Swiss-Prot record:
Belongs to the UPF0473 family. This is UPF0473 protein LL0144. Transmembrane segments: none annotated. Signal peptide: none annotated. Pfam families: DUF1292 (PF06949). It comes from Lactococcus lactis subsp. lactis (strain IL1403). InterPro entries: UPF0473. NCBIfam families: PRK13678.1-2.
Length: 107
């Protein structure tokens, strides 16, 4: 199955940050790498985050997190929701858009 890259995403060069609070109340700061408009295909938007304090693995890779979100009716930011592991179409789209974004960053 092929997927065209027709999703809008933010190429903002000024980094934005978000603080996430885990179930134990610990706060962690993340940089927002990219937001993806998936409204037309999936009815929600997505965000890919990178911890501001991270360690690369032995291959030089860094773990990133992806969440879905819907904006509040007044246009303000909404809540982040985990993306189900079995939502293969959503994960495929996120991976494709994120990889394209990373390729553009390397140019």
């Amino acid at each position: 199955m092929t997927h065209t890259h027709d999703h809008e995403h933010d190429h903002n060069h000024e980094p934005d940050y978000i603080t996430l609070v885990d179930e134990n109340g610990n706060e962690s700061l993340f940089q927002i790498l990219i937001t993806i408009d998936g409204q037309e295909e999936f009815g929600k938007n997505y965000v890919v985050l990178q911890p501001t304090e991270f360690e690369e693995d032995e291959q030089g890779l860094i773990d990133v997190l992806a969440y879905s979100f819907t904006e509040n009716a007044d246009g303000t930011e909404g809540d982040l929701q985990p993306i189900p592991e079995d939502a293969e179409d959503e994960w495929d789209m996120i991976e494709e858009v994120f990889n394209s974004f990373m390729d553009e960053q390397e140019d």
